Each structure stands twice: as C-alpha cells, then as structure tokens.
From Swiss-Prot:
The active site is at residue 63. InterPro entries: Anion-transp_ATPase-like_dom, ATPase_ArsA/GET3, ATPase_ArsA/GET3_euk, P-loop_NTPase. The lineage of its organism: Eukaryota, Fungi, Dikarya, Ascomycota, Pezizomycotina. Zn(2+) binds at residues 282, 285. This is ATPase GET3. HAMAP family: Asna1_Get3. Its EC number is 3.6.-.-. The gene is GET3.
Amino acid sequence: MSTAVINADDDAMEPTLQSILDQRSLRWIFVGGKGGVGKTTTSCSLAIQLAKVRRSVLLISTDPAHNLSDAFSQKFGKDARKVDGFENLFAMEIDPNGSMQDLLAGQAEGEGAEGLGGMGGMMQDLALSIPGIDEAMSFAEVLKQVKSLSYETIIFDTAPTGHTLRFLQFPSVLEKALKKISQLSSQFGGVLNGLLGANGALPNGQNLGEMMEKLEALRATISEVNQQFKDERLTTFVCVCIPEFLSLYETERMIQELASYQIDTHCIVVNQLLFPKPGSDCEQCTARRRMQKKYLDQIEELYDEFNVVKMPLLVEEVRGKEKLEKFSEMLVKPFVPPS
C-alpha cells in the first residue's frame, strides 16, 4: 500500500487527498464507486488540484452517462480537448461500447473495416468471440491517445462499480485477444496471403502483415500498461461513497476486488455529509446526521489505514469551473463545519 500522509498529533491518516498530489510517481488514477455518489465531481476536482502540481493532466470519462461535459459546462468528445480556463488540463469522453470494428477501421487508413470484405468479417467475428472484447476496445482507443500525447497523469472517471471493475480487467482481456489473433496469423498467414494475392493485400489495399504488426505493437503496449496498473507507485484507485448502507457495501466489495487485481487503493472520499448547526430544530437533519454518523464510524473503523476525506452536502449543485475549484479545495484542506 502506498505511503500516505500521517497526522502526527493523533497518529491517524490525514483526511485529505494530499498524499496523491505528493506522490509524484503516480501516472494512473481511477475514481469510482456506486452510481450517484459524486464520482464525476470528485474526479474533476482531483484533476483540478493535480493540474496545479503536474506538467499535464488528462481526465477521461468511461461512464456511458458522460458527465464531464455537464460538470465543466463544456462539450467534450472522444478526442482530448483542453478544459477552458486551464493550460495543462485536458478531458475526453470515450464510448465504453466501442467495438473491434473501430480498431480494424483505425488500423486501415482507407475504407475502414467494411472495406475488408469477407476477410474483415472473419477477423471481426474472431475477435468478438472473446468475452469482454467489445467493451475493451474503448480502452485500446485510450491507450492510443495517451501514448501519442504523453500526459504526466491520467485520471479515469469510471462508470458505476460493476462496470468499473470490468474496465480494470480490459488490459488482460485485450492482451489475450490480440495474442490469439497474432498466433492465428502466424499459423495461417501464408494461407491467407495466398488467398489474398501475391502482395497479401486486403481489399482496401492494406497489407495483412502490416496490420498484424500493428496489432502486435498494441498488444505489447497493453501488456506494459497492465503491469503498470499493478504497481502501487504508478497506479491508485480513489473510492467515492456516501454514508449509507448500500454505498458502504459496494465500497467494501470494490476494495476487496481491487485487492484481488493487485490494484492499490488507500483513499476514500465520503460525500454528502450533513453538518446541522448546533441548536438546529430540523428533526430530519438531526435524524439523518445520526444515521450518517453510524456509517461514517464504520468506515473509519474498517479503513483506519486509509485517507478518509469527509465532504459536506452542499446547497448548490457543483457545476462550472469556479464551483469545482472551490469543491476541490476541500479535497486537500479538511472541511471545518460551521460552529
């Protein structure tokens, strides 16, 4: 587990994400949790703080809802775009339902996958027969952009819990898929080239050997990234939750699965905390605060070796650069409830 900031006064973990900012070696940061707990707000805010201390930061949404555009009040797409008001913060929203057809189209500069004719269909059918490959192709698109643009830190605003954990398996899925395709190409490449003609050209003019070389290069990149995900110096996962039973249950399940994937996690952000003013006569507020405190106590007991960040429930929605910047400050400076 990564070294985190210690509060010398009480020997407790610092209740901020400052340890992530201080860990200069981090390259991949995942932010995830149950739906509706504030993942996007947290990931955007963390990206803003990281942009202050990193050369370049890329924020990627893999959530089908694509809330980055809403959070920053700026339209993002599948290509990285600079976030308005920042010089070194970029964002993109990728389609988690990308397909092998996209990859084949990307390998060919001409007519795309449709131009491969029956051979392209065979390659696509072969690739899609591997479980999880269809979703995993979005990850290949990310790798292609990240490798060419060399960002210092990449933050993933992930989909709700189940999709997040599948996404973290994608490097392994892609690696197996591309390895299988490469093996089949080695075994039957001669036969295919014979069928295609003397120069081994596909119907769109691309050489089969060239395409397989590109696939193999992609496989090598995926293998490298897969190793980086398991290195606590390079990768960490920030869990986001709210102080309720289902969210706490999902967080525990996610932490257990992350451990099984050998992915580091040592930070939990607890959003939507109520802090009723002393003497408040709001019975609902007091009752809800009592319930929240019960689950917050459980979180602090279960994860005493984690940085647990307590974020207040705000009156207004956190949207736009100014509000996100204000929210982001509370990730590195503990929120002090009004007395």
